[in-house]
Amino acid sequence: MATKAVCVLKGDGPVQGTIRFEAKGDKVVVTGSITGLTEGDHGFHVHQFGDNTQGCTSAGPHFNPLSKKHGGPKDEERHVGDLGNVKADKNGVAIVDIVDPLISLSGEYSIIGRTMVVHEKPDDLGRGGNEESTKTGNAGGRLACGVIGIAP
């Protein structure tokens, strides 16, 4: 059973980063940094597939094995892959420090082999008042992505 994972984020533009995942009890700690972003919030999600053959688009929708509507990371109604937003500073750097009780590195909610995506816009956490909000949080385009793999 994997207890650690890593993801290298890359895209067509300047956005890049490294994200690490570590299982701690019944939660997963997500840490790392992303550079090349515009200042402000950016949606941050685990997507269904580990397929990046057509860039980040082929990663599919948010990882949602429970068939729920999109929400924030602290919401009862959320996709497993809904990790909310990362916040970039004026230098375009986002420091990631998330503890999530729903994602896992093993079992039915395992994110191993799936794609981590950082988005162009803020995630409205499903509160945008339209259909797209309940699917994607209106987070916009996919700036960078990478497949989550087992780490030593």
From Swiss-Prot:
Cell compartments where the protein resides: Cytoplasm; Nucleus
GO cellular component: axon cytoplasm; cytoplasmic vesicle; cytosol; dendrite cytoplasm; extracellular space; mitochondrion; neuronal cell body; nucleoplasm
Parts forming coiled coils: none
Catalytic activity: 2 superoxide + 2 H(+) = H2O2 + O2
GO molecular function: copper ion binding; protein homodimerization activity; protein phosphatase 2B binding; protein-folding chaperone binding; small GTPase binding; superoxide dismutase activity; zinc ion binding
Top-rank lineage group of the source organism: Eukaryota
The UniProt record lists the keyword Nucleus: yes
Cofactor note: Binds 1 copper ion per subunit. Binds 1 zinc ion per subunit.
Residue positions, PTM Phosphoserine: S104, S106
Complex formation: Homodimer; non-disulfide-linked. Heterodimer with SOD1. The heterodimer CCS:SOD1 interacts with SLC31A1; this heterotrimer is Cu(1+)-mediated and its maintenance is regulated through SOD1 activation.
Job of this protein: Destroys radicals which are normally produced within the cells and which are toxic to biological systems.
Protein name stated in the entry: Superoxide dismutase [Cu-Zn]
Gene that produces this protein: SOD1
